[in-house]
Amino acid sequence: MLLNCLCLKFLRLIEVRERGIYMTKRAVWAEIDLKALENNIRNIKSCIKNKAKWCAVVKADAYGHGAVAVARKAVEQGADYLAVAVISEAISLRQAGFTTPILILGTTPVEASADLVAYDITQAVYTIEQAKAISAEAVRQGRTAKIHMAVDTGMSRIGVRPEQAGDLAQALSTMPGIELEGMFSHFALADAKDKSFAYQQLEAFKLAISKVEAKGVNISIKHIANSAAILEMPEAHFDMVRAGIILYGLWPSDEVEHVIELQPIMELKAQIVYVKMLHPGESISYGCTFTAQRESRIGTLPMGYADGYTRMFTGKAQVDYQGKRAPIAGRICMDQCMVDLTDVPELQQGDVVTLYGSASLTMDEAASWLGTINYELPCMLNARVPRVYKG
C-alpha cells in the first residue's frame, strides 16, 4: 500500500511539475496555450470592420507554434482563409484534413502548378507566365484554380505595379480554368507610429483597384491589412484582413498601440537535468569563455543551437524561475547549455525553467538580447523541440 501511494505521488509530481516531459519524453518543450489563442482571436475579430473576412496566417509552421493545431483553432473560431508562404505548407494542411481555402502568399515554381490545382490551393500571381502554367494544369485536370493577384505598393518584393494592375487583371480573368478571386498587397510600415508611408501604400492599392475596375474586372476579395493595420487602420480592411503575429499574442512592434488584450501563447521550457559545483578558476563549455570567480552551482539544460536556441544568446540570455533569473554560463552548445544557479539556491536538478515566454521573461525581451524582433524567436525553434498544447 505504501509503495503504491509513493508511486502514485511520483507520477502525479511528474504530470503536474513536468507536464511537457511527461507528454513528450524530452526535457525541453514549447508549451502552447490554445485557450490564450482563442482569446486573442476573439479580441482580434472585435477590431475587424465592414464585416470583412479574416485570414489566419499560419506560415512557417504558424510562426513556430504548430500550423495544424493553430489552424484548427482558427477554423473553429471562424477563419475564412488560411495563409502560408510555400506550397509544402499548404499541402501539409490539406493532408491534415483542412478544407478551408488556403492562400500561398509567396512564389510557387511553375513546375508545381499541378499540385496547386490538385490540392485546391489559391496562389499569389503576379506574372502571365505563372498564370499560364496554372491555367494549363487546371484545364488538364478539369478544375478551376483560384488565384490572387499580388500588387507591389511599396515593399518592392513581388507584385505588379499599381498602374499595371488593370492590364494584368484583364489578362488573368480571361484565362481558362482560372478564377481571379482576389488581389492583395502588403504594408511595409503599418507598425510604425508615423503611418505616412502606410497611407501612401493604401492609396497605391486603391489606384490598383480602380485600374482593375476600369477594365471591367470584378474581384471579390481585396486585402492589404496585416496585423498592425487590423489594429490601427480600419480603412484598410476592405474585404479581408490577414492576422499574423497578433494571433500568437505578440505585438507587431513597440510602436503599435495596445488597443486590445493579447496573451502570448508560447512558453519555451526546459528541465535542469544535472547540477554540479564549479570551483574558482574552473571553466565551462567550448572556448572556456566562462571561468568561475567563486564556488558556483551550474545546471545543465538539454537545449542548444540545434534546437533553435541560438549560440548568439551566449553571454546575454537568462532563464526564469518563478520570477527569479539565472544567467546562461559559457557558450551554448549544439544540444546543451549551462546556467549559473548560484544566486537561485532553490533551483535543483529536475526543476523546470523558462527560457522565454513567461510573464516575467517575455519573447520581446529575449529578442532584444539578439537585436531582433519577436517574430524570429519562435520561428527559429525546429521540430526537435516538442510542442505541448494545453487549453
Predicted regions: what is each one?
Residues N43-I48, Q77:
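A short, Lys/Arg-enriched amphipathic alpha-helix followed by its capping loop at the start of a domain
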Residues L2-L3, K59:
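Intrinsically disordered, low-complexity Ser/Thr/Pro-rich tracts
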Residues T24-E38, S46, K53, E89, ...:
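Active-site anion/phosphate-binding pocket segments in diverse small-molecule metabolic enzymes
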Residues T24-E31, E38-N39, A52-H223:
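Active-site-proximal beta-alpha core segment in soluble small-molecule metabolic enzymes
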Residues L3-Y22:
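Short, Lys/Arg-enriched N-terminal segments with co-localized hydrophobic residues
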